[in-house]
Amino acid sequence: MIIRNTDGRQMLRWMEDLWDYPRSITGHGTRSTLEYLKNINPDLNIHSFKSGTRVFDWDIPDEWNIYDAYIEHESGQKFAEFTKNNLHVLGYSIPC
């Protein structure tokens, strides 16, 4: 994607807009990010494939969406809260 006449401030606004999208390799955050980028560059072609589809040596995984996650101390204090920083959770984590 080549976008001409774009300064650093505009790119920073895009990054700020996209920060909260919970992106992984699948899921609503990834689709929302791609749609956002398509609004910037209408020439972007977006393709989707069903989970389980074989692509070369890789099977497309099940969709993964996250809404909340955290580590909680026995006192009830929460740490590494996803709602405060979406980098606290690794994609495809599973609840314990």
Residues covered by each model-derived region:
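N-terminal hydrophobic/helix-forming segments and targeting peptides
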Residues: 1-96
